[in-house]
A protein has these predicted regions:
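Conserved pre-motif I regulatory segment
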Residues: 1-58
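Walker A/P-loop NTP-binding motif
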Residues: 3-9, 66-90
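Conserved C-terminal RecA-like helicase domain
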Residues: 48, 91, 131-136, 270-324
């Protein structure tokens, strides 16, 4: 929040000075880097504010992205209304506050969280603009943004003006590069306004794409990705075993027994100390099996793995006396 406060103060007060300061930092970063790893500077001969109106927050799941989003809305509204802003910002009115999500389930989740926070919000309705547009947050799935209006889609150019655009998991859809459909939509929506993006996995999204890497290198204001989140004592302990087929076949039973014993240990610890865990919001332990397929039709390998796990559990629950 403090970084956002400093950035918005400088962005609204003197965008030219902010651009110059960022370019100085890029120069320092590039000093000891090979050319292939250097970051392109911002264009100091072009309009400054339009190169600075996109911020991103790289934050691990569970680290408070939603709470930060709520605070960012209030911060932006505060600085937009300041009377001593630079002339390019002075007196500008907010057209809409838009939250883009990847799916309807997440839209509904955000709606509930806005309600709990006391922030006016609604699911976007293309057939009518509410009286509180610009004050109420309008939530819309990014998949419904198209070039032209349709039965279940809305044209991007319907959102003209000074919009504040919030994007949850902004990297989704960036696989097409900087010219991908999603990035074009994001850029169009905040062309005369501002955008905040929030994601846990920017690194995976930009991997292998020099253009996206350069873009987000200049727009990520805060990096609290999982390595830092975990290093501060949050998140889950995990271990990844990459087993080839032969090793897995030979040791699957041993591996599942070890997992079962670990799960029992966690359950027992929780049962005996539940009252002590309650202040930390720790829930009852859960054992999850994750397959590689997310489609309705499971791949043969996934189906086979699931059957093996179910057979193991069936043997366990039907053999309480320990007989083979």
């Amino acid at each position: 929040m403090l970084f956002t406060e400093i950035y918005l103060d400088r962005y609204f007060r003197d965008p030219d000075a902010l651009l110059a300061a960022i370019n100085e930092q890029i120069d320092r970063y590039n000093e000891d880097k090979p050319e292939a790893d250097q970051i392109a500077k911002l264009d100091d001969s072009a309009e400054s504010w339009s190169q600075l109106n996109k911020l991103a927050f790289w934050m691990a799941t569970g680290s408070g992205k939603t709470l930060l989003m709520h605070a960012n809305i209030l911060q932006y509204q505060h600085y937009l209304a300041r009377p001593d802003n630079h002339e390019v910002h002075r007196g500008r009115k907010l057209n809409r506050i838009l939250l883009l999500t990847p799916n309807e389930g997440l839209s509904q989740q955000h709606l509930r969280e806005f309600e709990a926070a006391g922030i006016d919000a609604e699911i976007f309705n293309k057939d009518g603009r509410g009286l509180f547009a610009g004050k109420s947050v309008e939530i819309l799935e990014v998949t419904k943004l198209k070039e032209e209006m349709g039965d279940k889609t809305v044209a991007i150019d319907a959102f003209e003006g000074n919009n504040l655009v919030l994007v949850d998991e902004g990297h989704r859809g960036t696989s097409g590069g900087q010219d991908g459909a999603w990035l074009k939509a994001r850029n169009a929506l905040c062309e005369d306004g501002f955008s905040f993006e929030y994601s846990a996995t920017f690194q995976q999204a930009v991997s292998g794409n020099a253009g996206l890497t350069d873009l987000y290198a200049k727009s990520i204001l805060f990096n609290y990705s999982y390595r830092y989140f975990y290093g501060d004592g949050f998140g889950k302990d995990y271990q990844i075993l990459n087993l080839d087929d032969d090793t897995q076949a030979q040791h699957l039973e041993l591996y599942l027994v070890a997992c079962l014993l670990t799960f029992y240990q966690q359950q027992r610890l929780y049962r005996e100390h539940e009252a002590e865990f309650r202040p930390f919001n720790i829930e009852k332990p859960l054992w999850i099996f994750v397959g590689g397929s997310v489609t309705q039709t499971l791949a043969n390998r996934d189906a086979s793995d699931i059957v093996e796990i179910l057979k193991f559990l069936a043997r366990y629950v039907s053999n309480r006396n320990g007989k083979r």
